[in-house]
Amino acid sequence: GCCGAFACRFGCTPCC
């Protein structure tokens, strides 16, 4: 899974 602010910054969506 891709969760966390760092994940969002890496273009991982949707963000948890």
From Swiss-Prot:
Disulfide bonds: C2-C16, C3-C12, C8-C15
Keyword 4Fe-4S (UniProt): no
Tissue: Expressed by the venom duct. Is present in all duct parts with a highest content in part 2 (proximal of the venom bulb) and then decreases in concentration toward the end of the duct.
Coiled-coil regions listed in the entry: none
Post-translational modification: Contains 3 disulfide bonds.
Key words of the record: Disulfide bond, Secreted, Toxin
Any one GO molecular function term: toxin activity
Gene Ontology CC: extracellular region
Subcellular location as annotated: Secreted
Domain of life: Eukaryota
Similarity field: Belongs to the conotoxin M superfamily.
Comment text on domains: The cysteine framework is III (CC-C-C-CC).
Protein name per the record: Conotoxin tx3d
Organism, scientific name: Conus textile
